[in-house]
Amino acid sequence: MRSSSAGTPFTAQYACEICRERKVRCDRALPKCRRCDRLNQPCSYNQAHQRRTRDEQLKQLQERLAKTEAQLAMNTTAAPLSVRSQSRSEGTELASSTRWIGTPDSFTPNSCSRRSSQYQLPTTSTSQSQLGSVLGTTAANTPMDLDNIRGMSATSGMSTNGSSLFDSDLFTSFTEGADSNMTFAWTNQPLMALEPLDNMLLNRPQSAPPNGSEEDLSPTDLSLLHNHYFESVYFSFPFINRDRFTAEKTGSRSPATTALVYAVALAGCTRSLQDHNRQSTCYGLARNYAERCEQEDHLNDLNFLQALLLIGRFEAMNRKLERSGLTLGRAAMLCKLLKLHQMDKSEHSQGMQNRETQSGPRLALPHTKDPVLLEERRRTFWGLYILQSYVRTRTGWEFQLEDTKNLQINLPSPGLLRSDLEPLKMPSLLNISTEPAPEITSYAGCVLMVELALRCFDNGQKRDTPGFWDDYCALVKKTDDLFKTLKRHLNATSIREDPVAFSLYLNLRATEIFSHDSAITKNEEQGLPPLMVAESQRRATTAAFQICSAVGLNLPSPWKADSDIIMLQAIFIAWPLTMALKALYRELVRGGIRETVNGVVASIRLLFAALDHIEESDGHWHQCVTNVEAKLQEWDEKNSFDSLAL
């Protein structure tokens, strides 16, 4: 094996074949690089690469450059010379004259060198029996019914739709005595490699088109992107009535409608690799038409508000948190002006308020009695509520919507949002109870989860106040009650098939961990008995294991990239993954019997694989758990890398 003249005799000149294929950094160590050694994978160096001379390499680069120049020349000559229609000219002029902060930098899939995880996600290309072994086993007194999951081994290849075998109950009550000593069968399974769909990630900035102008999209392209959105992304964030959207996009030329047309297309771009080059166009036009709504006083249009939500969501996924905060802050102020947070206030109370505030601004949405349109307005408001909670979780900024006690708007109704929907009368956020009726959807469940999480955050920041323990106990009870209310969405079938239910479950468990983390910190500050700390740690660890099991239910398939729920819900599940890693870190530091530690390490590896799947190694959430990765490496070195075959 040749070594690099610039390196040491113990390094190769080029990366190993596996690292080259994944386009990740390789330390080129001989005889086996550290990444392959960690993953227990075969490591080999192609001798052909070692024998290439500098002239051969230069020739290859020149050939690639010539092909690129030829392709650019073809694209230039193929540009249409005909005069654009008036509407498209207006879009181009608008794009060049009015801009917000600016469009993202250009996305070139081959230019981004994203770290492929040291811990690759196993794929679902294995049989269902293997998946059952991945999910592993628990102690007999663990309330998670994983026996049903292990039963999948007898149904290899069976569809998960409607299968009772996948309907395992992931619901847990703290009073049931959950045990965190969990043994995972995946500790003896090789972790199959899956390239993390790097080019589909939205954490690379996009660049503005040349000369600050935007190229418009054809109606065919827009229709294709809209279909991508409504057939995949929509179900993870369902607040737009597709029937109304389809009718208005063809019959209205208002800037609000046009802004929403491009915003929906922008969201559709996120699920298709070949559409990445259209993101810059959609993003720029969506923002420019949204700016035009303010310039031309089209503020009282639901389309404008929905466009802001989709733009803010895209910016958050792009790691442009400051920009997303401004966009969603604009949407929050618009909701206040339109009084969406009080849209279900009683007529008598509404009349009194109108008389009290008649000197204020008179901005309002057009009056309607259409129940479907009213339901769409509610879902739009709650969509903003959920997005704002993400920004606060990520940044710590203040919540910009009205305080919860001032919200007089009903929860989202069950049913697909379309023209034939008959919405149910739903309670408000403050009037919800543990009664089984009315039906609470997973989308409404996310609203309830966000309200609980915000209360937990506030209590965690007030550890010095005398009422901390009272509030902590009340929040633990409220968490138990919420699990009972949402139990129908917290089974394996729902978590596999419903992206909203998946993120709902993970965030509920993460909220549990956050509450217990606050209690652990308070215990340590007050010097309370170690038994109280151990109880909080046990509960947090149990929740972390259950997050890991839910992730195991949604392992991505290389043949169904568009159904990758982990990637689809990336913006909402990074925090739960991080909280679970922190809880398991404490368990790893504490140590214990070998079976328990093996289960902890296996879970940490799978959680890191999921986090690497949705974020770069230098991302915010990775920086929050650097101590966990360091501890895992220390454990690996101490155990000579032979305790786990992952």
From Swiss-Prot:
Name by which UniProt lists this protein: Depudecin biosynthesis cluster-specific transcription activator DEP6
Phenotype reported upon loss of the gene: Affects the expression of all the depudecin cluster genes and impairs the production of depudecin.
Disulfide bonds: none
Classification via PROSITE patterns: ZN2_CY6_FUNGAL_1, ZN2_CY6_FUNGAL_2
Domain of life (superkingdom): Eukaryota
Keyword Ribosomal protein set for record: no
Record GO biological process: DNA-templated transcription
Residue ranges for the DNA-binding region feature of this UniProt entry: 16-43
GO CC, one annotated term: nucleus
Gene designation: DEP6
Polar residues composition bias: residue spans: 349-360
Function: Transcription factor that positively regulates the expression of the gene cluster that mediates the biosynthesis of depudecin, a highly oxidized eleven-carbon linear polyketide that acts as a histone deacetylase (HDAC) inhibitor and makes a small contribution to pathogenesis.
GO MF annotation terms: DNA binding; DNA-binding transcription factor activity, RNA polymerase II-specific; zinc ion binding
SMART domains: GAL4
InterPro entries per record: TF_fung (IPR050815), Transcription_factor_dom_fun (IPR007219), Zn2-C6_fun-type_DNA-bd_sf (IPR036864), Zn2Cys6_DnaBD (IPR001138)
Keywords in alphabetical order: DNA-binding, Metal-binding, Nucleus, Transcription, Transcription regulation, Zinc
Location(s), subcellular: Nucleus
PANTHER family: TRANSCRIPTION FACTOR DOMAIN-CONTAINING PROTEIN-RELATED (PTHR47338:SF10), ZN(II)2CYS6 TRANSCRIPTION FACTOR (EUROFUNG)-RELATED (PTHR47338)
Matching SUPFAM superfamilies: Zn2/Cys6 DNA-binding domain
Region: Disordered, residue numbers: 76-130, 345-366
